Amino acid sequence: MTDTRPLLLIDVDGPLNAHGGPYSGGDAPDGYVMHRLHNGSFTDEHGRPWAQGGLRIWLNPAHGPMLLALADRCELAWCTAWRETANEFIGPLIGLPELPVVPLPDGWVTLNDHIWKLPGVEEYAAGRAVAWFDDEFTPADDEWAEKRTADGLATLLVHIDPVHGIRQCDADRVGEWASTLAAVSISGEPAVGTPLRVGDRAP
């Protein structure tokens, strides 16, 4: 049976792996735990070895339950440069089950000022409503979301501050959006015109 829930696409670096720790040289935000990952295949996939002592990432164990609380209203899927390895290394550390993975283009080449993942998302999410956590959206992506919504496919881009990662207020926005879509679907009213995009970063 076709899943009628909207998709919820989840990036790793920034939304889950806070940039405040690994990329700025500073401390991770409160609630985050540092992990060291070891995987010999990283050299083959990305052309360089893991950092000595393992790759350090910062994850918040609260993110797993926070995302799972949305699973009754959204179908969760990875949309990340980690690709399938998100299921191997990220999900288990925060309590997520194995999730579908959006096939993404090779490399990180932007197209017409859009986020590099957009071609993969357009193909994967064809015909479905989409909410998306990422920290690399551009103004062109916001325009894409607005047009997609106006064309009848509700689209919510949640801009995540990579220093703090996904906050409860971000998850609440997705939950409210998905509940609105469900109510609209039951009533039979068109979804176009409801508030469906979050373009501002959380305070």
PLM regions: where:
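C-terminal cap/substrate-recognition subdomain and adjoining C-terminal extension
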Residues: T85-P203
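Alpha-helical substrate-recognition element adjacent to the catalytic core
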Residues: T2-T110
